[in-house]
Amino acid sequence: MIVEVMLKPEIHDPQGEAIANACHRLGLGQVLGVRQGKRFEVELEGPADEAAVTAITNLARDLLSNPVIEDFTLHVG
C-alpha cells in the first residue's frame, strides 16, 4: 500500500515555493507552483483486505501524518 501525505491546501508550503522558485531560475517558467509531500510504501504480509486497509488508515492518521496540517491518501494495489 502507498500512503501519500500532503499539506492541506490552506497551509503555507515554503519548501514547495522554494522548489518553484528554483524551477524559474532554471528556465522552467511553465511551472506555476509546487507542493511537496511525503510518500510511504507499506509492505504487508498477506492480502490488503478490509482489516489491513483499516490498520494502515489508522497508521497514516496517527503516525505518518499530522491531521491538523496534512491530508493523506491511501492507495491499495
Predicted stretch roles:
Residues 1-77:
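Non-catalytic terminal accessory/regulatory regions of metabolic enzymes
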